[in-house]
């Protein structure tokens, strides 16, 4: 069952049953909440005594249960991972207090309160493991062992950054790794394929002149001897595994040049014209991988491709969070590595 992408992708009730572990957790927490709520009402009305802070706890837990249902149905767990983890941790403390308030009592209503909060405590602990487990952790494949469509929280928050610069925002992926500083500015490319590259251009004026283009990747900034001086580069998903040859270019004053295509006067990008520049080589799909889960490509990012569970794809390189892949019908794009298993 393909999962819908979060962030306004609509509600899909079927996603509740797509992840078997989450299905069990949601059902157990619902049953536990009902038992605890009825027990607290009976204890408050009878001889069980006042429940005090547990009334705050029971409604906090209700808020969490409803929120988890909605986030699973919209496949938005990763987007709200931090908030959900924080409130679940708070609720875990109160659930332990709920157990302690009635576990040693001989009153049946208070025993029901303890039983209900015991179920809630178990689910809260597993939820915290699910929300905080990173992809590199040994627990990651365990908590996602029966997933058939729900995007794990760690998969959405690692290696991907969402900006709110426009309608719907822009999505950018880190291609170069860590942050740093350098002489030559930085190159950025948004998920829609448009690129911005900043650099220092030589000449008498010696000013800073930005260049714009529709290149799938940011401009490379090199010195006359080929040594890169650029700051961290951010490239579009289409250039995650670029096979472009290394060019040695001679710059103007200062020895710095840019390979990115410049913009013509009518807005169309002019083709790069550098003497001796080599053309890009075709990517070599040297690996094959099978999809562990179904995946629905983000409609706002044309570089992603969808695939079904069990589908075999050709892979260019198996490093990084996102792999350049080719489907059997010839469609190419990028896929999340945590959804794939190399053959």
From Swiss-Prot:
In terms of SUPFAM superfamilies, this protein maps to: SH3-domain (SSF50044)
- In this chain, the stretch annotated as Disordered covers 231-281
The coiled-coil regions, if any, are none
Q: How does it sit in the membrane?
A: Multi-pass membrane protein
Which intervals lie on the Extracellular side per UniProt? 42-52, 105-111
The UniProt keyword set, sorted, is: Cell membrane, Glycoprotein, Membrane, SH3 domain, Stress response, Transmembrane, Transmembrane helix
Segments forming domain SH3: 284-343
Which ranges does the record list as Cytoplasmic topological domains?
1-20, 74-83, 133-343
The family database entries (Gene3D superfamilies) matched by this protein are listed as: SH3 Domains (2.30.30.40)
Where is this chain glycosylated?
A: 107
Asked if the record carries the keyword Manganese, the reply is no
Q: Where in the cell is it found?
A: Cell membrane
The UniProt regions of compositional bias labelled Low complexity, in chain numbering, are: 235-245
What are the transmembrane regions? 21-41, 53-73, 84-104, 112-132
- Which Pfam families does the record cross-reference, listed alphabetically? SH3_1
GO terms (BP aspect) = actin cortical patch assembly; regulation of actin filament polymerization
Q: Name one GO cellular component term.
A: plasma membrane
Output the InterPro entries linked to this UniProt entry: SH3-like_dom_sf (IPR036028), SH3_domain (IPR001452), Sho1_SH3 (IPR035522)
Is Cell division tagged as a keyword? no
- Summarize the subunit comment: Forms homooligomers.
Q: Which PANTHER family match?
A: ACTIN CYTOSKELETON-REGULATORY COMPLEX PROTEIN SLA1, FCH AND DOUBLE SH3 DOMAINS PROTEIN
Its function, per the record, reads: Plasma membrane osmosensor that activates the high osmolarity glycerol (HOG) MAPK signaling pathway in response to high osmolarity.
Family membership: Belongs to the SHO1 family.
User: What name is this protein filed under?
Assistant: High osmolarity signaling protein SHO1
Native organism is Sporisorium reilianum (strain SRZ2) (Maize head smut fungus)
């Amino acid at each position: 069952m393909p999962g819908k992408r979060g962030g306004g992708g609509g509600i899909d009730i079927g996603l509740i049953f797509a992840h078997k572990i989450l299905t069990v957790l949601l059902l157990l927490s619902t049953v536990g909440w009902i038992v605890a709520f009825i027990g607290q009402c009976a204890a408050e009305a009878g001889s069980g005594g006042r429940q005090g802070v547990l009334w705050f706890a029971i409604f906090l837990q209700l808020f969490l249960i409803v929120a988890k249902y909605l986030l699973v149905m919209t496949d938005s767990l990763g987007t709200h991972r931090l908030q959900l983890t924080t409130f679940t941790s708070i609720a875990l403390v109160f659930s332990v207090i709920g157990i302690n308030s009635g576990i040693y009592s001989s009153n049946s209503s208070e025993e029901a309160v303890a039983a209900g909060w015991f179920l809630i405590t178990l689910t809260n602990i597993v939820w915290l493991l699910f929300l905080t487990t990173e992809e590199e952790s040994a627990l990651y494949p365990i908590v996602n062992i029966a997933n058939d469509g729900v995007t794990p929280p760690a998969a959405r928050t690692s290696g991907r950054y969402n900006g709110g610069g426009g309608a719907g925002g822009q999505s950018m992926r880190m291609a170069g790794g860590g942050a740093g500083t350098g002489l030559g500015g930085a190159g950025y490319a948004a998920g829609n394929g448009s690129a911005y590259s900043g650099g220092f251009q030589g000449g008498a004026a010696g000013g800073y002149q930005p260049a714009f283009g529709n290149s799938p990747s940011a401009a490379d900034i090199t010195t006359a001897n080929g040594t890169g001086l650029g700051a961290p580069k951010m490239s579009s998903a289409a250039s995650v595994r670029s096979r472009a040859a290394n060019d040695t270019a001679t710059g103007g004053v200062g020895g710095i040049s840019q390979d990115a295509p410049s913009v013509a006067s009518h807005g169309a990008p002019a083709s790069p014209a550098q003497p001796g520049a080599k053309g890009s080589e075709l990517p070599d799909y040297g690996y094959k991988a099978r999809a562990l889960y179904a995946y629905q490509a983000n409609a706002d990012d044309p570089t992603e491709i969808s695939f079904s569970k069990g589908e075999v794809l050709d892979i260019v390189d198996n490093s990084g969070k996102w792999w350049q892949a080719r489907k059997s019908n010839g469609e190419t794009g990028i896929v999340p590595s945590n959804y794939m298993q190399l053959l």
